[in-house]
Amino acid sequence: MNTSHSQAIFGAAQALMPGGVSSPVRAFKSVGGQPIVFDRVKGPYAWDVDGNKYIDYIGSWGPAICGHAHPEVIAALQEAIEKGTSFGAPCALENTLAEMVIDAVPSVEMVRFVNSGTEACMAVLRLIRAYTGRDKVIKFEGCYHGHADMFLVKAGSGVATLGLPDSPGVPRSTTANTLTAPYNDLEAVKALFAENPEAIAGVILEPIVGNAGFIQPEPGFLEGLRELTKEHGALLVFDEVMTGFRISYGGAQAHFGVTPDLTTMGKVIGGGLPVGAYGGRADIMGMVAPAGPMYQAGTLSGNPLAMTAGIKTLELLKQPGTYEKLTATTQKLVAGIKDAAQSAGMSITAASVSAMFGFFLCEGPVRNFEEAKATDSERFGKLHRAMLEHGVYLAPSAFEAGFTSLAHSEADIEATINAFRESFAAVA
């Protein structure tokens, strides 16, 4: 496969941007080789600058659930852009998307739009502290909530990909109030509450972990967190930046039947444009300025382009049969991946929920980040390179979830499974 143009562009980028990229995982540090530079995307496919075509299972890291450049989303954006790219003022489209989010997500009675998942998580942390008058927060090892200082503690893929424990430049004082527990370990959470009476503002987690690979909550875990937070006067926050509108129209909280106090969102709700949001109970959201004293603002928040793309994407997702199709597509893919690995004599643990999936090259089960680290990362790197040669683009990290879309056809899935068969055989 010829990637000479990708190599030349990435080579030039080294002198222009740190590591030659705008986000670390794109540099292929954990899988080896040089990154592929894309030229265009459409449906389930991506084409690089050398003309190579790939079946894409990253989907812009989650937003492209309807497929890249969906014609209805593009048409809506073309109409909207004629009116301007950003107003810096209230926009009627904000009301429309807000109503759709509130209607869909069980916990959300009011919502504030921002520009990224990181922004949403930064704001929600400030909000739970403002509302409770407490400073400490519990997060889970391997859960990633953006690159804000206070969350860069055992933060999963963002740092695992680079082999860093945390990040230089984060003062100890900043993370002194960030407590961590192993995912799926209620006893550890109980111990933290016991050790910090009336000091914990809230618990934040990915209801399905997508930044330490793909890890599902064990039965009773989310329910137990809901009970513990209520018992101790703390707030429960679901980071649904990844799972929101992806595993069901109402997100993970609708899928599992557990309603948090607050929810952060992003990715899908922007239809491929930069967006984030946080929302929840009206009495808590009433703390946010200008309604209340907790300050948070953003120049491009609620801009008409992101709102337009989000509205059209949610309209597409609300159509009957959407999530049944996504589930069937992903289940077929994961079954094929498992069979391909086992046929090659390799250990594998693989699972999916709706349009989100993942696999570890180790014996399961994988219930937390510590167990996830047992995956054979070196072999995954070889597998990743082999899959590229077969025209399949996977996340360039063993600690990232994968994503399917409505655009992936049965033929795409069959081609992908065949690529896995040949690639597993080559790296076994």
From Swiss-Prot:
Compartments it resides in: Cytoplasm
Flavoprotein as a keyword of this entry, yes or no, is no
**Looking at the Swiss-Prot or TrEMBL record, what is one Pfam family this protein matches?**
Aminotran_3
Describe which pathway this protein belongs to, using the record's wording.
Answer: Porphyrin-containing compound metabolism; protoporphyrin-IX biosynthesis; 5-aminolevulinate from L-glutamyl-tRNA(Glu): step 2/2; Porphyrin-containing compound metabolism; chlorophyll biosynthesis
- Per its UniProt record, what InterPro entries does this chain match? 4pyrrol_synth_GluAld_NH2Trfase, Aminotrans_3, Aminotrans_3_PPA_site, PyrdxlP-dep_Trfase, PyrdxlP-dep_Trfase_major, PyrdxlP-dep_Trfase_small
Query: Is Isomerase a UniProt keyword of this protein?
Result: yes
An MF annotation (GO) of this entry: glutamate-1-semialdehyde 2,1-aminomutase activity
What GO cellular component term, any one, is given? Answer: cytoplasm
Which residues are reported to carry the modification N6-(pyridoxal phosphate)lysine?
267
Which reaction(s) does its UniProt entry say it catalyses?
A: (S)-4-amino-5-oxopentanoate = 5-aminolevulinate
Q: Which UniProt keywords apply?
A: Chlorophyll biosynthesis, Cytoplasm, Isomerase, Porphyrin biosynthesis, Pyridoxal phosphate
Cofactor(s) needed: pyridoxal 5'-phosphate
Q: What processes in GO biological process is this protein linked to? A: chlorophyll biosynthetic process; protoporphyrinogen IX biosynthetic process
| EC numbers, comma separated | 5.4.3.8
In which family does this protein belong, per the annotation?
Belongs to the class-III pyridoxal-phosphate-dependent aminotransferase family. HemL subfamily.
What HAMAP family is this protein classified in?
Answer: HemL_aminotrans_3 (MF_00375)
What does the subunit section of this Swiss-Prot or TrEMBL entry state?
Homodimer.
PANTHER family in alphabetical order: GLUTAMATE-1-SEMIALDEHYDE 2,1-AMINOMUTASE, GLUTAMATE-1-SEMIALDEHYDE 2,1-AMINOMUTASE 1, CHLOROPLASTIC-RELATED
The protein's name is Glutamate-1-semialdehyde 2,1-aminomutase
Organism in which the protein naturally occurs: Synechococcus sp. (strain CC9605)
Lineage summary: Bacteria, Bacillati, Cyanobacteriota, Cyanophyceae, Synechococcales
